[in-house]
């Protein structure tokens, strides 16, 4: 061997102290500058490289304090930030203490490079003390890594060694990383699959179980690249085949391959998908879902489950993004175009096309489910694309032509997902389409005024509400009805309509509590605004910024009560156009009536009070609900109606209270109480709660009345004068209700004195009676309530309120509130149906 040339490569020098261990004590051998150097010797037939750590004396640079070769199985330990300690091949313990941590970093990096390129058997380990000082943590920075054999011919021995190595390498992150790179680089999974097929053919169960455990161990490495490689086309069948064998169930085997090959989970194209990249992503997403939910469901821990879920979410996002630009969605939704559907009725439509439409509903539902995890803006973008491409045609087909209840439920779930995200999204997209069509018409016809007129007269599209209402009234499937009611609640919730319209209000320096511009009780809007903001009037710029949204929401609910509510609540509307047979069919449908009663409670509580109250009272809906409490109906329906009545009286609304008193709507409640007088059941508890509400509110009013009379002299004078002139005492809606039930149903209440709340009501009634002028009682019966609620004007008929009377309630409400707060010494003139008349009658 002939020497050719020698090259030396060195690192920067760093100041350091050198220590040697002698007699169990560290001896300082001097201070100098340390550097690492690699000596490359070129020989004729090969190249030899050697690495050294050299320390030269800081005062005498030519004097070498240390020259240590990096060789053999030396383990270098980095302790804390500035120490490197090791034992050389001769057994000497050496330590280098660097002046700065940067110097230690430089030499550690040198050791890492030497291990990777020159001396693979050396290692570098970081040693860190734990917080309590009672131990240390070791982390491998670099070092030799034992790896499984990649010989083509595997056997039981090599598989056992591989399993042991893979398990050992999970101890340190460095070992895991090196193992993953090795496995992917050398296609080790393909090697396992090949031997698996051989072992299965030759019936070698030990090898089959070993391969299964090896693959599961690699899954536990929790590395994304390995997980994704398992579901590639060339590997997926082999992987699920390996995972059919489980050492926990040695006598049985799963059938994952059969499931993938023969049943529905296989990739199915309703219409041809030409985008091969998208097709690959869809397949990979499904296979990962299959692994997570079926194959590995009993094996995955939380970390593995989280990783696979994250991968699936990323793939689903990719799918949704691709579908928005791919023609696949257009081709799919063309199956539901109205021309094709209605024309197909004239001929025998092929079974294949019907099946495609069924599968299309499932596919769109899957896409909607995928989109639930998208960001808000991405989700809105996708939903808008669906609506523009014809989603409503699909929904129309599902609800009007499809007979499979499961598919109808999926279509309803699709609606719910969209309206829960943005209740106005569908309407806004349809409005954009309408405006676009108007602009096109303008370009073609050149008639600008006509286009403007068309846009100005555009009305709110309530097609979705109409579809849902029809389903609720006509479909008997309980699961579908539940979803429809959920969708209706979302569509009809005022807060859902607000959306992001007020996001910019904070930019104006204002903090609106609960969006006071859209409160249900908005009669004193300026006062509420002044109380919360300190401003005397609502600033014009605030109204301008939200005016369009407010008008849109107001029109939305206005049209609901005109177009949809009469049909939706038809079974509860008195004197509607239904035949007796049709009405009886609805009334006998307990599930439907329960849903409708809950919806009535919802709109009374959540909607603008004026418009919802007008609709409810004008159509005698409360009378119908009260009638449902009578005997002859299912107990659950009777209790639902009772709950609705309780919710409405809790609104503390004058008009609701007077209507229910004057029409004796509490009579069925008392009958129900008599039925369950001494029973310990749900009905009795619900009825006790009814009395609790009245008793507690009467008590609260009493306290407030005392505070009003004695807290301020001015108020005391005005209140006394008002009471003297009106000949009445201060009252509340609940006080009136208490008087009504005590005057009307004393026998029933006397039987209920064992109930604390009923006893309180009787005591409050007696106390209230003593306070009446001259000690005279005045009963609140249906007859004398008629004196002030307008029934005598309505030809003396009780029951349903006339339209004119309800209009009176609404017209006078603002003036009434002003009058009630007035301190004018002149008594106000009482108007028909006004609160002033109501108080005076008592």
UniProtKB/Swiss-Prot annotation:
Keywords of the record: Nucleus
The UniProt record lists the keyword Nucleotide-binding: no
Major subcellular location class: nucleus
GO BP terms, alphabetized: DNA damage response; meiotic recombination checkpoint signaling; negative regulation of DNA damage checkpoint; negative regulation of glucose mediated signaling pathway; positive regulation of double-strand break repair via nonhomologous end joining
GO molecular function, one term: protein phosphatase activator activity
InterPro entries on file: ARM-type_fold (IPR016024), EVH1_PP4R3 (IPR055236), P4R3-like_central_dom (IPR006887), PH-like_dom_sf (IPR011993), PP4R3-like (IPR051137)
One GO CC term on file: protein phosphatase 4 complex
The organism's place on the tree of life at top rank: Eukaryota
Compartment(s): Nucleus
Function text: Core regulatory subunit of the histone H2A phosphatase complex, which dephosphorylates H2AS128ph (gamma-H2A) that has been displaced from sites of DNA lesions in the double-stranded DNA break repair process. Dephosphorylation is necessary for efficient recovery from the DNA damage checkpoint.
Self-association and partners: Regulatory subunit 3 (R3) of the histone H2A phosphatase complex (HTP-C) consisting of PPH3, PSY2 and PSY4.
Name of this protein: Serine/threonine-protein phosphatase 4 regulatory subunit 3
């Amino acid at each position: 061997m002939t020497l050719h040339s020698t090259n030396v490569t060195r690192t920067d020098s760093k100041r350091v102290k050198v220590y040697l261990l002698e007699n169990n004590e560290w001896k300082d051998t001097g201070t100098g500058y340390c550097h690492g150097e690699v000596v490359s010797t070129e020989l004729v037939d090969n190249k030899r490289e050697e690495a050294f750590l050299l320390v030269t004396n800081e005062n005498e640079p030519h004097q070498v304090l240390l020259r240590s070769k990096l060789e053999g199985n030396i383990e270098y330990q980095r302790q804390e930030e500035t120490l490197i300690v090791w034992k050389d091949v001769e057994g000497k313990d050496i330590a280098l203490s660097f002046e700065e941590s940067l110097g230690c970093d430089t030499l550690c990096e040198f050791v890492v490079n030497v291990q990777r390129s020159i001396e693979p058997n050396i290692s570098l380990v970081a040693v860190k003390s734990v917080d309590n000082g009672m131990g240390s943590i070791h982390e491998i920075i670099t070092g030799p890594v034992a790896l499984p054999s990649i010989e083509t011919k595997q056997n039981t021995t090599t598989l056992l060694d591989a399993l042991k190595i893979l398990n050992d390498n999970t101890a340190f992150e460095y070992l895991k990383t090196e193992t993953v790179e090795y496995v992917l680089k050398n296609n080790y999974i393909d090697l396992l699959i090949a031997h698996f097929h051989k072992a299965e053919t030759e019936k070698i169960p030990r090898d089959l179980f070993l391969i299964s455990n090896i693959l599961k161990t690699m899954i536990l490495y929790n590395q994304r690249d390995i997980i994704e490689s398992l579901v590639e086309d060339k590997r997926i069948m082999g992987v699920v085949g390996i995972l059919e064998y489980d050492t926990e169930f040695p006598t049985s085997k799963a059938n994952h391959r059969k499931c993938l090959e023969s049943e529905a989970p296989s990739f199915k194209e309703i219409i041809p998908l030409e985008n091969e990249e998208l097709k690959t992503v869809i397949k990979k997403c499904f296979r990962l879902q299959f692994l997570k939910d079926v194959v590995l469901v009993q094996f995955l821990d939380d970390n593995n489950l989280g990783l696979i879920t994250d991968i699936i979410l990323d793939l689903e996002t990719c799918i949704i993004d691709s579908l928005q630009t791919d023609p696949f969605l257009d081709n799919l939704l063309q199956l539901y175009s109205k021309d094709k559907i209605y024309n197909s009725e004239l001929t025998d439509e092929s079974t294949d096309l019907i099946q495609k439409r069924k599968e299309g509903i499932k596919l769109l539902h899957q896409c909607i489910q995928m989109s639930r995890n998208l960001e808000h803006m991405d989700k809105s973008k996708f939903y808008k694309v669906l609506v523009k491409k014809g989603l409503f045609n699909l929904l129309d087909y599902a609800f009007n032509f499809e007979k499979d209840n499961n598919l109808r439920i999926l279509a309803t779930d699709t609606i719910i997902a969209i309206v829960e995200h943005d209740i106005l999204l569908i309407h806004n997209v349809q409005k954009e389409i309408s405006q676009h069509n108007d602009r096109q018409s303008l370009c073609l016809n050149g008639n600008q005024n006509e286009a403007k007129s068309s846009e100005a007269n555009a009305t709110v599209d309530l097609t979705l509400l109409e579809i849902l209402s029809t389903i609720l009234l006509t479909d008997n499937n309980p699961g579908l009805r539940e979803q429809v009611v959920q969708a209706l609640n979302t569509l009809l919730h005022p807060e859902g309509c607000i959306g992001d319209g007020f996001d910019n209000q904070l930019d104006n320096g204002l903090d609106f509590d609960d969006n006071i511009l859209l409160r249900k009780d908005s009669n004193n809007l300026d006062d509420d605004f002044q109380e919360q903001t300190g401003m005397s009037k609502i600033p014009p710029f605030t109204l301008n910024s939200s005016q369009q949204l407010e008008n849109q929401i107001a029109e939305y609910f206005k049209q609901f009560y005109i177009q949809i509510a009469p049909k939706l609540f038809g079974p509860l509307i008195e004197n509607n156009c239904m035949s007796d047979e049709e009405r009886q069919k609805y009334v006998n449908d307990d599930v439907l009536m329960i849903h409708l009663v809950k919806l009535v409670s919802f709109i009374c509580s959540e909607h603008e009070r004026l418009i919802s109250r007008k609709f409810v009272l004008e159509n005698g809906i409360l009378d119908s609900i009260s009638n449902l409490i009578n005997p002859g109906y299912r107990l659950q329906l009777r209790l639902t109606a009772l709950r609705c009545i309780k919710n409405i009286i809790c609104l503390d609304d004058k008009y609701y209270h007077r209507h229910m008193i004057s029409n004796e709507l509490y009579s069925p409640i008392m009958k129900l109480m008599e039925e369950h007088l001494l029973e310990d059941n749900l009905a009795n508890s619900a009825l006790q709660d009814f009395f609790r509400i009245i008793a507690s509110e009467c008590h609260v009013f009493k306290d407030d009345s005392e505070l009003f009379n004695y807290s301020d002299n001015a108020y005391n004078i005005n209140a006394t004068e008002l009471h003297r002139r009106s000949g009445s005492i201060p009252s509340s809606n609940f006080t009136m209700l208490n008087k009504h039930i005590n005057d009307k149903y004393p026998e029933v209440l006397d039987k209920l004195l064992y109930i604390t709340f009923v006893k309180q009501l009787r005591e409050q009634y007696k106390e209230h009676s003593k306070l009446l002028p001259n000690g005279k009682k005045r009963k609140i019966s249906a007859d004398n309530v008629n004196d002030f609620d307008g029934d005598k004007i309505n030809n003396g008929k009780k029951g349903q309120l006339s339209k004119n009377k309800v209009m009176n309630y609404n017209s006078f409400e603002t003036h009434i509130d002003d009058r009630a707060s007035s301190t004018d010494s002149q008594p106000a003139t009482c108007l028909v149906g006004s609160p002033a008349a109501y108080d005076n009658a008592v």
